[in-house]
UniProtKB/Swiss-Prot annotation:
GO terms for biological process, alphabetical: translation
Gene coding for it: rpsO
HAMAP family: Ribosomal_uS15_B
Source species of the chain: Legionella pneumophila subsp. pneumophila (strain Philadelphia 1 / ATCC 33152 / DSM 7513)
GO molecular function: rRNA binding; structural constituent of ribosome
SUPFAM superfamilies from the UniProt entry: S15/NS1 RNA-binding domain
Descriptive protein name: Small ribosomal subunit protein uS15
């Protein structure tokens, strides 16, 4: 896996909405984005790793669905999240 517990805790603390928040869309999208970044670096060295490529596609789709949900329900939180993560507004 790409993230250890300390890195996950750091990301969760940055994007959490409450004290024990680990499931808000912001936290989920930020964790998925860090895994996507790790996998894209992984594919630069391992071009034939097609099994992980399928996992990457699943992560991208999951992030897309979460961002679409967040945009539909709270536009302000969506805008701040994509600005913080450096994503395009294409959802």
């Amino acid at each position: 896996m790409s993230l250890n517990s300390a890195e996950k805790a750091e990301i969760i603390n940055e994007y959490k909405r409450g004290d024990k928040d680990t499931g808000s869309p912001e936290v989920q999208v930020s964790l998925i984005t860090s895994r996507i970044k790790y996998l894209t670096d992984h594919f630069k060295e391992n071009k034939k790793d097609f099994h992980s490529r399928r996992g990457l596609q699943e992560l991208v789709n999951k992030r897309r669905k979460l961002l679409k949900y967040l945009k539909r329900n709270d536009q302000d939180r969506y805008q701040t999240l994509i600005q913080n993560l450096g994503l395009r507004d294409s959802y």
